[in-house]
Amino acid sequence: MEDLTGITGNSYVVVDLQKIKRNVEKIRAHIGENVKFLPVLKGATCGHGLEEIAEFLVSECQFDMLCVGHTIEAERIRNFGVNCDILVLGGTPFNNIPYVVENKITTTLSNADYARALSAEAVKRGTTAKVHIKINSGLGRMGAKPGDELAALLNDINGLPGIDIEGAYTHFSNSAKIDTAIIEQEAATFDSGLAQIKAAGITLKYCHAANTPATVRFPQYHYNMVRSLLLLVGYDWSVDQFNRLGLEKVLYWRGFVAQINEVKAGERFDYGLALTASRDMKVAVTSFGYSDGYPDDLPGNGGFVMVKGQKAPILSLNMDQGFVDITDIPDVCVNDQMLLIGQDGDEEVELTELLANSKHSGTYFFSLINHRVRRIFKR
C-alpha cells in the first residue's frame, strides 16, 4: 500500500512505470530489432494514464513515436511537453486539421475529402502533414478496400501538395482466435493494398498491421512495425499460450471502507430497499461508486473486492458509494483499504476471474476508470 499523506481522492490507482519499462524490453526482445514497437495510448492507455506514461516512454524507454485514438489525446501529450511523433488512429474531424498541421501530428488517411482539406491547410501554413493510409482488410471500419476503392483514393491523393505519406496500416478483426483462416485472409488483403500503393509510386517508411494478439502470435505479420496497448500494461490473453512474454501487470486500484453497518436478517436497504439481508450481516459502505468507473454489472454477479486478504462480495453499487458483504471477514475497520483490481503485495484481484460473469472485456473495464480516481505513478 502507498503512503497517501496529503493525497486527496476516495480511491486511487497506482501505476508502476518501471514495470512498463520491463514490459517494453520484453516486447522488443520478442519482435526483434528490425521491427519497431509503437505504443498505443488511446483511452488514456486504457485508463492507466496518458501524459505521464507518454513522457516516461519517451524519456526513459527511448520511444520517438506514440499513437493515440483521438486528436485531443495528442493535444494533451503535446501540452505536457512531449514532442515525439504522434499518430492518431481514429478519424480526424476537419475542425481538428489546423491543430494537427500546426503541431506536427500524424493522422490516418482513408478518404480523399480529408486528404484535400489537410493538403490545403498544410499549403496555407507552408509545411507538410504526415499521414498513414488506412487499408480496410476486413474489419469494415476506417480504411479503403484494396482494388477499385483504394485505386480511386490513390489517384485522388497522389501528388497532393503538403502531404507526406509516411506509412500504411490495417487493423485485424480476428487475431485472437484459434482459427487462423480470417487473419490469413486479412493479411493477404493488406498485402494487396500495399502492392497497389507501391505500384502508385509511393514509398512507405512504415507498414503495420499487428495488434496485441497478432504481435504475440503471428511474427509473419509484424511487417516493420507492431502496435499494442495491452502488452504495454501487462495483459496478454492469447488463446494458445497465456502470457508467453512473462509481462507484468502495472496497475492496481484501491478504495476504502467508509462505514460499517450491522444489518439484521430480513432487514432491507439500498435504493428502493432493493437488498434484503439473508442473515445477520456486516456490510461495509465503499468509498467508490459507478461514477468512478466501476462496471455496474458486477455487483451481485460475481463482483468482489479484497479486504484484509479475503474476498468480499459487492452487493450493490450507487453513484458514489456501494455495499460490500464483510460478514465473514474479522476485524474490518473504517478506513481499511479494499483492493478492486490488480495485485498489491499478497492481495490480488485477477481480471479474468472478476469478469467471469460480466459482458464486458478487460479493455472496457480499465477504460471506464475515470478522472476522479487519483493516479499515482511510481517511477
Region spans (language model):
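Active-site anion/phosphate-binding pocket segments in diverse small-molecule metabolic enzymes
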Residues: 2-16, 21, 72-73, 92, ...
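Active-site-proximal beta-alpha core segment in soluble small-molecule metabolic enzymes
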Residues: 6-7, 11-22, 29-206
